[in-house]
A protein has these predicted regions:
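Histone-fold recognition with a strong bias for associated Lys/Arg-rich disordered tails
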Residues: 1-176
Length: 176
């Protein structure tokens, strides 16, 4: 399905994933199988981030009331619209999940210059991608997404003043 969006070319990893990040992807694949999905989507990545309990993403999500219990019912009720098919790569990842993984790699390499990509980059990229099932699930679960974004940055030791306009485009907004 071509939705008119420009697709990024899947980058080869130039920095390695942390053990926690690799575990998130494994748990996402496991969640997709448990759900009977023929693909691994952003909703499964979100479940993987929650199930992996040691990473920044898991801690921030749990601190903001995003739990596996809340998400499982919402995910199991998700159905593709009639006539639409999830397009996926050979590994079963949807294009939107690939976009998030690309975005995480870009953030880690180009903006934060880290040596390993951790779970926090999956969470930041999910929020910044904006149009994905995982983000809609967080919002439906009652999460304050900007708060999650800024708490993730704070957990990384980032100066929050430099990121006030990331989500709003307005440097005066973005924080309480």
């Amino acid at each position: 399905v071509n939705d008119g969006r420009k697709r990024k070319v899947w980058k080869s990893m130039s920095i390695p994933y942390t053990q926690n990040a690799r575990e998130v992807l494994r748990l996402a694949e496991e969640a997709a199988k448990e759900n009977g999905s023929g693909y691994v989507g952003t909703e499964h990545l979100l479940l993987g981030m929650i199930r992996e309990q040691a990473g920044v993403a898991s801690q921030v999500l749990k601190n903001n009331g995003i739990t596996e219990e809340k998400l499982k019912d919402m995910i199991s009720s998700l159905r593709l619209e009639e006539g639409k098919t999830a397009v996926m790569d050979r590994d079963g990842y949807t294009p939107r999940l690939r976009d998030i993984l690309d975005g995480a790699m870009e953030l880690a390499e180009e903006q934060y210059h880290v040596k390993e990509l951790g779970t926090e980059f999956f969470l930041l990229a999910t929020i910044l991608e904006r149009q994905n099932v995982a983000l809609k699930l967080m919002e439906a679960a009652g999460a304050n997404v900007p708060k999650i974004y800024f708490e993730t940055l704070a957990a990384m030791g980032v100066n929050l003043q430099e990121h006030r306009q990331d989500l709003t485009g307005d440097p005066q907004q973005g924080q309480d």
